[in-house]
């Protein structure tokens, strides 16, 4: 589950991992984009379709109809990165091994949206990518691992985001 270009790096790593079967991809619905405001798919959907993966784009991820679809897929694990919707308890309980979130900060610092921007804004000396088991809270589950990276004076949100996602995907 993911919705932005950063999510694509993680999805690419999962698709190419020899011991992983990406059964489906969940992303946000197509929306108006660009200067002409055409309804277009997001980057995660485009990537998934390029790799012939089934794509689901529920307006509300916790609705019964979509939960039934997930039950039918019977995933071992659900991996989430920058998805943009809160996962309810029913959804979190569906995969056999749970849901794993990849978050671009060293949790618990900078939970929620815009963690890279907040790390720079607050003058943090380091940041990273945290892999965690998801629970009902916002970025509050058990931490599985952290990859750390120093924040350099010349870092921007863009450069830092690209490096963190690449490190996290490895």
Regions found by a protein language model. Name each.
Residues 17, 21-26, 50-80, 85-104:
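Internal alpha/beta domain cores that form substrate/cofactor-binding pockets in large enzymes
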Residues 8, 38-41, 63-67, 85, ...:
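Structural motif corresponding to alpha-helix initiation and N-cap regions
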Residues 1-36:
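N-terminal Rossmann-like dinucleotide-binding module
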Residues 1-5, 48-53:
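Acidic/glycine-enriched edge-of-secondary-structure segments
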Residues 5, 42, 166-170:
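A structural signal for well-ordered alpha-helical segments within the folded catalytic domains
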Residues 31-51:
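N-terminal beta-loop-helix "entrance" segment that forms/cooperates
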Residues 77-170:
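Donor/substrate-binding cores of folate-linked one-carbon enzymes
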